[in-house]
Amino acid sequence: MMANHLVKPDNRNCKRPRELESPVPDSPQLSSLGKSDSSFSEISGLFYKDEALEKDLNDVSKEINLMLSTYAKLLSERAAVDASYIDEIDELFKEANAIENFLIQKREFLRQRFTVIANTLHR
């Protein structure tokens, strides 16, 4: 192992003092050996959390998809009801138009009839 050499900090171009910088270990292998047990448990815990989070996200995604499909079905049913109402209204307008035409013809027929009666009475 190499001994750590004390280096006098050069503050001319530095924005922060050297004490705040993290020390660089002499050997990355030695520094990671002490951490291996704790980092392994942290990593396995993270994997467990990631798996649990992914499961929760999948469950939420399924619920959202179910709600969206239910909403789409509801909108489709309402659109079908609206279309049937439009068809009924169209039929009512056709029937009203037929009745109006019948009444116009009836009025014209009665007018002609009254004209004939009036002409007969005036003679």
Curated annotation (Swiss-Prot):
Compositional bias segments (type: Basic and acidic residues): 7-21
Disulfide bridges in this chain: none
Keyword Signal: no
Transmembrane segments: none
InterPro entries for the chain: TEX12
Disordered: annotated segments: 1-39
Subcellular localization, as worded in the UniProt entry: Chromosome
Keyword vocabulary terms for this entry: Chromosome, Meiosis
Tissues expressing this chain: Testis specific.
Compositional bias segments (type: Low complexity): 27-39
GO-annotated cellular components: central element; chromosome
Biological function: Component of the transverse central element of synaptonemal complexes (SCS), formed between homologous chromosomes during meiotic prophase. Requires SYCP1 in order to be incorporated into the central element.
Subunit structure: Interacts with SYCE2.
PANTHER family for the chain: TESTIS-EXPRESSED PROTEIN 12
Protein name as it appears in the record: Testis-expressed protein 12
Source organism of the structure: Homo sapiens (Human)
Gene (UniProt): TEX12
